[in-house]
Amino acid sequence: MQSTYFQEATELWNQSLHNSLKVQDRRFSSEAWNSNPVAAFNAATYLLNARTLMGLADAVQGDAKTRNRIRFAVEQWVAAAAPSNFLAFNAEAQKKALDTKGESIAKGVQNLMHDIQQGHVSMTDESLFHVGKNVATTEGAVVFE
């Protein structure tokens, strides 16, 4: 696994020297990622590391339940660590900030302030949901699959 990682990392580096990196992942499908060599290298490096970490998780020996939990935890961590989740590394968000003269950043800060006031992150327009009309409440449990 180590030799494969170093071989792929070397290939990635060599491709970046010739500006021939093309990242094949929906999170990095915007032209902003591929037209910026630093962003493309960052995305490609992330994908290499993500594949390697998932490979390590798959290689864990043990019972199926433990292996599934490890895989799930690593998968969540890897997804959260994607450069598309951070403004400092997100080429598409940076381009939008430039194109909107910072308006997209201001809107994002407004959304953040609203979420802080609510005490949780909004994932959808909560005003569209009303208990008893289009949302039911029942007791339940979290199920790990």
Model-flagged regions — what are they?
Residues 1-145:
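Amphipathic, low-complexity, repeat-rich surface-exposed segments
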